[in-house]
Amino acid sequence: MKAIKDDNIRFLVNWTLLSTILIPLGAILGYFVGLSVSAAFGYGYNGGEPPFVSTVVYCCWGTVMTTIISFIQWRMLSKKIKLSYLWIPLCVLGFIVGESIVGILLWKLDIQRGDLGWAQGGSILAEALIFAFSGTLIGLFQYTLLRKSYYKAEMWILVSTIAWGLIPLVIFIFGGLTLGAITGISLIWIFKLKTK
């Protein structure tokens, strides 16, 4: 019993530490990819680009960030549970679909997505809501993998929503710590509810 507890603590510490490092790293690398994509369309990264370009930029930025974090998550989870590599594209897809839906809504409302970003001086609450929406989709998509083996795996949707939504509120460095702690604790709890 002590070995299981020690293994869970080790998992939680590693999961949280890696999230703390990788969320900001992914955000920084994604920023440069987004900047390059914006420049390829003939714009800077300070807003002002058309809604389509803005949506593409944020999707590219998010793709880099979610690919990095979900790859490491998958590697760690695969050591504890049987988990498909689809964990990675489902995370990326959730973020892209979320940003695309937000991009379309903002375009219809004549609001520039780039103006909402906290790094551009926009509302951190708006950024948190956008991240929470994408987190909901990420959780929903990843739930399809967890539900096959774990009772109450639907909690992952709520956990993902909260964890991703908190990232902008506590800035990305501490957002990674927050995401890692919340999702790590939740996964340990979900693992205890194995159905098969």
Language-model regions: role of each:
Residues M1-K196:
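Juxtamembrane/disordered regions of integral membrane proteins
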